[in-house]
Design a protein with these regions (language model features):
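Extracellular interaction modules
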Residues: 81-83, 103-125, 148, 178-183, ...
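C-terminal motif of bacterial Sec signal peptides marking the signal peptidase cleavage site
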Residues: 20-23
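Middle-to-C-terminal accessory/interaction subdomains
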Residues: 129, 142, 167, 175-177, ...
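Secondary-structure capping and domain/repeat boundary segments
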Residues: 35-38, 42-124
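Bacterial signal peptide processing site
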Residues: 25-27
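Conserved NTP-binding catalytic cores of kinases and kinase-like/nucleotidyltransferase enzymes
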Residues: 125-217
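Internal "kinase-insert"/substrate-recognition segments embedded within catalytic cores
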Residues: 194-195, 209, 231-234, 248-351
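Short, well-structured beta-strand/strand-turn elements
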Residues: 229-242, 358
Length: 509
């Protein structure tokens, strides 16, 4: 009896458990059904909301040859909401002036109301020359070529990444004859290294006036051609600017790299060792510590002769090396010459000087350098104020076929006595003549695009049609900027053709 009761109880409990599970399962299904229903209602509501709030596509664009969009260029955004911010990066040589929507800041975000495309408006920088504004402390006048004044420098009207305001610097006058003109040249030294117009970071820069060059273009053209060559282009970057000093407009200037031993310029060894890097200038003005080889003076530009680390041994070392090179070029062993001198650089330098008939090539501003353990290199050609027919007292340099550099520069004179060097010049001309023609065409296009700025310069300095030394009567009679520019163009075309005929007799181009 007792056993039967136990069995009955167990059976009863089992039934309760089974029915409980079924009941729970039934409730769960009901809950799932309810949840499903609610979910369906939510989806339905969302679908309704989406239909009521339209999504639109916005495309931010620019000419990819001029710049690029930074950020999400194509975005899908609900009506009434804002796009994610994007900005425009502009390639060097161009500037951003606004968006097609009317916005003027480089970064943009808009509230969306329709499908649309918004384009960045980018134009060449050459449409307007950059401005450089210099304020000296207390607006003190710059009167010295040796004493610096403190100043701040601002650059505008250029690619955004090269614009800045109130950078600390120092400024002084520079030049010899050029300092005597009304329009003064300057030397600028920033407190920290600055990259001006993509030409590499440096503290030292030069502001040339081109005052006696009534085309304002000779130095610009010469440095532009120099930039084509692989061995002499270390310090040839230039940029036209409109200069303001103490809020006074001073005209169009040319910002140039200072020829110096520096990263991104002439990159040679700096050390206290005797066999270190040397930068030398052939300079009959003897502007600094110098030595002579024969009757020609050479000034040591680097290492600094004012440094306590500089000794007589340094001077003797570089003088001895240059003497060995000079003896070699006067001899008959061309292999010996090539072991001491980088003849490629001298051939390229010769082409530039001869093409432009640079008057001072044998007198001053002829740079050479030698790295530790290395050969003697020709440096970047420099100073073309007197060139392309501006000759002063050097009447023999006037004709485009004068071969002035060959006759006046002692290094070129002796090197060109070697047939191998003549052949090298011919090979270089054959290779580079088409590139030179193309580069010059680009340069003249740039000049004419900026006509307004150049003509404004002569509103400040009313010298067209008047005598400015060292111009002769022929150049003085060219009384418009256009006539002056056209003169340089014709001269260069004739000069290049003459050099090709002289050194590339088999060239049929």
């Amino acid at each position: 009896m007792k056993r039967g009761a136990l069995v009955f109880c167990a059976f009863t409990i089992l039934l309760l458990i089974v029915f409980g599970i079924v009941a729970c399962t039934g409730n769960g299904s009901s809950l799932e059904s309810n949840n499903s229903s609610e979910s369906g209602n939510q989806e339905s509501n969302t679908a309704t909301d989406t239909n009521e709030q339209n999504a639109y596509t916005v495309l931010f664009s620019c000419d990819t040859s001029l710049g690029k969009i930074i950020g999400e260029a194509e975005q899908t955004v609900l009506e009434g909401e804002k796009t994610s911010p994007v900005s425009v990066y502009v390639n060097y040589g161009y500037r951003f002036i606004g968006w097609s929507s009317g916005a003027t800041e480089p970064e943009i975000s808009i509230t969306v109301s329709e499908n649309c495309e918004i384009s960045a408006i980018i134009v060449p920088v050459s449409d307007s020359i950059p401005t450089v504004s210099i304020l000296t402390d207390g607006k003190e006048e710059i009167t010295s070529t040796s004493e610096y004044l403190n100043c701040v420098v601002s650059i505008g009207n250029a690619n955004e990444i090269y614009c800045f305001e109130n950078e600390g610097a120092k400024i002084r006058g520079r030049g010899n004859t050029t300092w005597e003109y009304e329009k003064k040249p300057y030397r600028l030294k920033f407190d920290t290294k600055i990259d001006l117009f993509g030409n590499g970071k440096a503290k030292d820069w030069v502001l040339l006036t081109n005052y006696s060059d009534l085309s304002l273009s000779r130095n610009f053209l010469a440095q532009s051609v120099t930039s084509l060559f692989g061995t002499i282009n270390s310090c040839c970057s230039v940029q036209f600017v409109e200069l303001y000093v103490n809020e006074e407009y001073l005209g169009v200037y040319l910002i140039c790299e200072q020829i110096e031993v520096e990263k991104s310029r002439i990159e040679i060894t700096k050390s206290v060792d005797v066999d270190t890097g040397y930068l030398i200038e052939l300079d009959n003005r003897k502007d600094g510590r110098y030595f002579k080889i024969g009757s020609t003076p050479y000034v040591i530009k680097s290492p600094s002769t004012d440094s306590s680390a500089y000794t007589d041994e340094h001077e003797e070392f570089i003088k001895s090396y240059l003497t060995e090179c000079f003896i070699a070029i006067g001899g008959n062993d061309y292999d010996k010459i090539c072991s001491l001198i980088d003849v490629e650089s001298f051939a390229e330098s010769y082409i530039v000087y001869e093409l432009f008939n640079g008057v001072d090539v044998g007198y001053s501003s002829f740079f050479m350098y030698k790295d530790a353990g290395g050969k003697l290199h020709a440096g970047s050609p420099w100073d073309f104020d007197r060139s392309l027919g501006i000759v002063g007292h050097s009447k023999g340099a006037k004709p485009y076929d004068a071969l002035w550099a060959k006759e006046q520069n002692t290094w070129f004179y002796w090197l060109l006595r070697h047939e191998e060097f003549n052949s090298l010049v011919g090979e270089k001309l054959t290779e580079y003549a088409p590139k030179i023609k193309e580069k010059l065409n680009e340069c003249y296009e740039y000049l004419y695009k900026n006509r307004e700025a150049f003509e404004k310069n002569f509103e400040k300095w009313d010298i067209l049609g008047t005598f400015v030394w060292p111009n002769d009567d022929e150049l003085t009679t060219l009384n418009t900027w256009d006539l002056q520019v056209e003169y340089t163009r014709n001269y260069l075309n004739n000069s290049l053709d003459f050099l090709i005929t002289t050194y590339c007799p088999n060239n049929t181009n």
